[in-house]
Amino acid sequence: MNRRPRILVFDSGAGGLSVVHALREQLPDADLIYAADTAGFPYGKWAEVLLVRRILRVMRDLIDLVKPDCVVIGCNTASTLALDVLREEFQVPFVGTVPAIKPAAAQTKTGVIGVLATPGTVRREYTKTLIHTYAFHCKVMLHGAQRLAGLAEVKLAGGSVDPKDLLAEISPVFRKKGGAPADVVVLGC
């Protein structure tokens, strides 16, 4: 008898629960295990070398405990920083979540794309490579939102978020900068 595939979904907080929901719809027979590194949240503020070490340590413990057939990283920050290292370090397959720059470049009508992400994801070489490879013909407005992930966690936990705080975090990516405004915005938190 074949056993059900065991998939570990990992994120720094509750944001990856949307990944679990999508996986549940596509793979209803899979055993899904969700792990959030809330002790390390938010990842966007960490120094890169320290964050890679933390992710490796946490992932080693999770893989030993869960013994997954596959790991899905539901965090753009962790994926853009540590996905290659995780794939080298562990035998289990890893699937990352990275900013959806390729589909955004295909969908834009104005040629202007906004990327709303953590400061780390915005400045990462991985993100720049995605832009260079898939959106070279577009104007890409990057905005590293300092507090967006934290505001999302508060809301996901049932808390209240002041709309003014949210607007302050997201409005820079919607501002017109020397031409047409972004008609497609990518979320990369």
Give the role of each language-model region.
Residues 1-188:
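Non-catalytic structural scaffold of enzyme domains
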